[in-house]
Amino acid sequence: MTMKLEEIYQSFIAQGQAHDPRTMAEITRQLAQEKERYEKLSAEEKQYYDLERLTNPYADTRILAGKSTHKVKTILCGIDVETQDLLLADRLIEKGEKIDLVLAHHPEGQALLGLSDVMNLQEDVLMKQGVPIGLAQGMLSCRISEVKRAFLPYNVQRTINTAQLLKLPFMCVHTPADNQVQWYLENLFAEQAPVTVQDVLDLLRHIPEYQEAMRIGAGPILINGEPSRRTGKIMVD
């Protein structure tokens, strides 16, 4: 199956919204507020505005390099994709491998600078767990500001420039992918109703992806408490 780069991008956004902790009404309201902010900008300010924000609620998910019409059949995926990984992709292509798109989970470039913007989603997650929204916003405001400042001195375009010079289509998908995992685990726990912490660990260890991680010593572990303790309410974050 072959898809255009833009089709893949829009598909990821749609799947992210379908499995978002927020309702579609809440997401639509966010996009409407963004449109209002845009319309209030001066003509000069609009020159520098990221128009993707009007239709994509995930600032950490972007097409970073490549034409939207580029046809994709084979994708090289990675959690963290940086310059060395793009050079590897280019080398594999030289050796005859077919790679139409390099896809990263963690954001790069403009999407990395947008990471702090999607952290407001955590406020909604906490609110759904019973935390008053005012308290949730207060708890997260310092952390969001800290993350935003942390990336300001970064050379965020280095990896993007590499992809452009190598003529490699490059995309990152962060929050939409996280939403899928959160949705899956929340439904798993709701269906299986684990009673103890050990039950939770056992459920996770039956998931193929976690089993693969366990083989390299990176599987689920308990970092606080005892396996015999009751779970009570489970929050997936």
Language model features with spans:
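Hydrophobic structural segments
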Residues: 1-237
